[in-house]
Amino acid sequence: MAKATIYTSLMSSKTITVKECPISGELPYHMNFNKVLSHPELFDTISLLVENTIKIKETNKEIEFNKICATSSSAIPYATNIATSFEKGMLYINHSGNDNNDKDNIKHIKIEGGMEIDDKIILIETIVSNDFLLNNIMNKIRKYGGNIVGLILIVNLCEGEYVNLTTQKEKIIPVLNVYDIFNHLENNNLIDLYYCEKVKFYCENKTKANIKKLLPQPEEVKEEVEEETKKEIFVSQ
């Protein structure tokens, strides 16, 4: 029931808006998740859902932790609520200046709040971008002795945006996902089926693109790319 309320509220608060006539290949909706902070009831409901998700994992002995870490400024309010509720220490990441398109680059990533060696840390993020920032943050934490027990992802965009982390066997725990949000809105006549289909089509194509971007390609694929590049150079001469 909590999720259904959240889905509807994301629309009514205009955190999510649909584009009337999206151009082919363009994201068919707009999401400004920071708007949630201007709607206290919605923010509290999402925070409670995240908290309950962690409690279930903890009760089932799937995770054990002593620190909560916000990996972006947008995640700090949620991490603060959760750390207070669980009476755990809180950390946050300052990554200003990090080249997030460079995998394993840990320069300009600062862990604020006092991390100790062997801390067991849950990461909190609102939305993941299709880059290597989280990979770099995880590497930084581990280099300085922290243990990452899981990443709580508040909204899964269903675009393969963290496919690199799943292939690295990182424990990703999504709380909400875009498919469920739009299916709920369509089932309750808040949007047309057309928009659900557009979102699904966009996400499928974006996932394919992100797999190519974020994962190392097989050698035969690299050879094909190199061959095509040579042909393009030859034609242009």
Label for each model-derived stretch:
Residues 1-10, 15, 139-237:
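PRPP-dependent phosphoribosyltransferase catalytic core
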Residues 1-61:
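Active-site-facing substrate-recognition patch
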Residues 66, 119, 149:
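Conserved acidic residues
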